[in-house]
Amino acid sequence: MSCQLLPVLLLLLLRASCPWGHEQGPRSPSEEPPEEEIPKEDGILVLSRHTLGLALREHPALLVEFYAPWCGHCQALAPEYSKAAAVLAAESSVVMLAKVDGPAQPELAEEFGVTEYPTLKFFRDGNRTHPEEYTGPREAEGIAEWLRRRVGPSAMRLEDEAAAQALIDGRDLVVIGFFQDLHDEDVATFLALAQDALDMTFGLTDRPQLFQQFGLTKDTVVLFKKFDEGRADFPVDEELGLDLGDLSRFLVTHSMRLVTEFNSQTSAKIFAARILNHLLLFVNQTLAAHRELLVGFGEAAPHFRGQVLFVVVDVAADNEHVLQYFGLKAEAAPTLRLVNLETTKKYAPVDGGPVTTASITAFCHAVLNGQVKPYLLSQEVPPDWDQRPVKTLVGKNFEQVAFDETKNVFVKFYAPWCTHCKEMAPAWEALAEKYQDHEDVIIAELDATANELDAFAVHGFPTLKYFPAGPGRKVIEYKSTRDLGTFSKFLDNGGVLPTEEPLEEPAAPFPEPPANSTMGSKEEL
């Protein structure tokens, strides 16, 4: 120990005798570079605890990515992050992009509350204590636009008809705030929303001639679009003012096409639409007869604007995962399904008749009025479902087994693609083998991507639930360490663990978010 400590003491004495920045001789690789030399990689500042302060002083607008070398999401972000830096540099933007290796700089990770990777924080004017959490997209142009709207105006000031018309003509989605007083609090609300609505272009005016030009007599936010109705107005409440949440919901709802085709480019926006009911028309777009159905589908859509999102799924395209989610085969097209994203309940037309404007309208009304019962997916019960130590449950036998009053049933709800589920599989098998001679204990598993339950919905994987023997259909969710010892203690104590047991381990979300979504794309520490 003393042999290791002596060089450290000598180094401290030498540093105490030399002013920082005036040391002579070459630096060792482990030493930090002088303050004026913050290293760069692909146009990105590489920061440490010694250089973050300097970067904040030199750059009034600094976006910092906290990453981990082993993080797959970080690796996917890296090229887009570098492209964004290049785009902003070409524009001579005041924004600088930087990164911090979280595991190598634990002091910084702790200081800024980093618990998952990647985490991005935006620092303004050297303020180290209150950075803004980055909430934008994970592709280069989206990153650049998010930053542009924070260092520049988020809405263009419109002075005349020509400027307004040029803005409207130049983009698919344009939002213009018509306010008689630009110093009103409602304008601040409008500009705050404009910072984050990156798929729309924003304008702002107080000019009376523009109010007259667009037929307005009071403060109004107008969405101009090059499809469907062409325009949607959101009048500002004269007493309550402009509510950020209400305006946001309005813009999201009316910026969606009345009918949207599901594909990799639209999926993220479909799930972000905040409309809980989605009506899906499954068609084979290579067939003329199927394409003709889209007309009637579109004619029904306006009646349910804001209540039901109308989506077309082409079974001839790469949409097998959507078919699987609804338990359908491509041969079932054309057919309708409605799903509520909050409850995950799915509905199918009862009569199975032709798809027409009238039948679509009637089906939507029936579901919204609670007149249609949801259907549940289930695989067939395997002949050998109870022959292995881990019993196989499906939708059709779950109730009978899980709520058997003579058995204590411990169930793993999993997804075949879930990494966490695969990691815990050996411990689950070992648990089943350990208790296979206990007649009152059943260890089971259920593929929750192929089987649905009326009793509850499964939202993450793995989900572990314990169904103790006795009346009352009691359910206890297991939220502790996933290993044989802790599982055993839980079972032996009747579904209870001592309070000092470790907290729950992470679970994968269900369903998995789209690859380009900003949600769910982080790795926990």
From Swiss-Prot:
<feature type="site" description="Contributes to redox potential value">
    <location>
        <position position="419"/>
    </location>
</feature>
<dbReference type="GO" id="GO:0034976">
    <property type="term" value="P:response to endoplasmic reticulum stress"/>
</dbReference>
<keyword id="KW-0256">Endoplasmic reticulum</keyword>
<keyword id="KW-0446">Lipid-binding</keyword>
<feature type="disulfide bond" description="Redox-active">
    <location>
        <begin position="71"/>
        <end position="74"/>
    </location>
</feature>
<feature type="glycosylation site" description="N-linked (GlcNAc...) asparagine">
    <location>
        <position position="127"/>
    </location>
</feature>
<feature type="glycosylation site" description="N-linked (GlcNAc...) asparagine">
    <location>
        <position position="516"/>
    </location>
</feature>
<dbReference type="Pfam" id="PF13848">
    <property type="entry name" value="Thioredoxin_6"/>
</dbReference>
<dbReference type="GO" id="GO:0005496">
    <property type="term" value="F:steroid binding"/>
</dbReference>
<keyword id="KW-0325">Glycoprotein</keyword>
<keyword id="KW-0754">Steroid-binding</keyword>
<feature type="domain" description="Thioredoxin 1">
    <location>
        <begin position="27"/>
        <end position="152"/>
    </location>
</feature>
<keyword id="KW-0677">Repeat</keyword>
<dbReference type="GO" id="GO:0003756">
    <property type="term" value="F:protein disulfide isomerase activity"/>
</dbReference>
<feature type="active site" description="Nucleophile">
    <location>
        <position position="421"/>
    </location>
</feature>
<feature type="region of interest" description="Disordered">
    <location>
        <begin position="498"/>
        <end position="525"/>
    </location>
</feature>
<comment type="subunit">
    <text>Monomer; predominantly as monomer under reducing conditions. Homodimer; disulfide-linked. Part of a large chaperone multiprotein complex comprising DNAJB11, HSP90B1, HSPA5, HYOU, PDIA2, PDIA4, PDIA6, PPIB, SDF2L1, UGGT1 and very small amounts of ERP29, but not, or at very low levels, CALR nor CANX.</text>
</comment>
<feature type="short sequence motif" description="Prevents secretion from ER">
    <location>
        <begin position="522"/>
        <end position="525"/>
    </location>
</feature>
<feature type="site" description="Contributes to redox potential value">
    <location>
        <position position="73"/>
    </location>
</feature>
<feature type="disulfide bond" description="Redox-active">
    <location>
        <begin position="418"/>
        <end position="421"/>
    </location>
</feature>
<feature type="compositionally biased region" description="Polar residues">
    <location>
        <begin position="516"/>
        <end position="525"/>
    </location>
</feature>
<keyword id="KW-0143">Chaperone</keyword>
<keyword id="KW-0676">Redox-active center</keyword>
<dbReference type="Pfam" id="PF00085">
    <property type="entry name" value="Thioredoxin"/>
</dbReference>
<feature type="signal peptide">
    <location>
        <begin position="1"/>
        <end position="21"/>
    </location>
</feature>
<protein>
    <recommendedName>
        <fullName>Protein disulfide-isomerase A2</fullName>
        <ecNumber>5.3.4.1</ecNumber>
    </recommendedName>
</protein>
<feature type="active site" description="Nucleophile">
    <location>
        <position position="418"/>
    </location>
</feature>
<feature type="domain" description="Thioredoxin 2">
    <location>
        <begin position="367"/>
        <end position="496"/>
    </location>
</feature>
<comment type="similarity">
    <text>Belongs to the protein disulfide isomerase family.</text>
</comment>
<dbReference type="GO" id="GO:0006457">
    <property type="term" value="P:protein folding"/>
</dbReference>
<keyword id="KW-0413">Isomerase</keyword>
<keyword id="KW-0732">Signal</keyword>
<feature type="active site" description="Nucleophile">
    <location>
        <position position="71"/>
    </location>
</feature>
<feature type="active site" description="Nucleophile">
    <location>
        <position position="74"/>
    </location>
</feature>
<feature type="site" description="Contributes to redox potential value">
    <location>
        <position position="420"/>
    </location>
</feature>
<dbReference type="GO" id="GO:0005788">
    <property type="term" value="C:endoplasmic reticulum lumen"/>
</dbReference>
<dbReference type="InterPro" id="IPR036249">
    <property type="entry name" value="Thioredoxin-like_sf"/>
</dbReference>
<feature type="site" description="Lowers pKa of C-terminal Cys of second active site">
    <location>
        <position position="482"/>
    </location>
</feature>
<comment type="function">
    <text>Acts as an intracellular estrogen-binding protein. May be involved in modulating cellular levels and biological functions of estrogens in the pancreas. May act as a chaperone that inhibits aggregation of misfolded proteins.</text>
</comment>
<keyword id="KW-1015">Disulfide bond</keyword>
<dbReference type="InterPro" id="IPR013766">
    <property type="entry name" value="Thioredoxin_domain"/>
</dbReference>
<dbReference type="InterPro" id="IPR005792">
    <property type="entry name" value="Prot_disulphide_isomerase"/>
</dbReference>
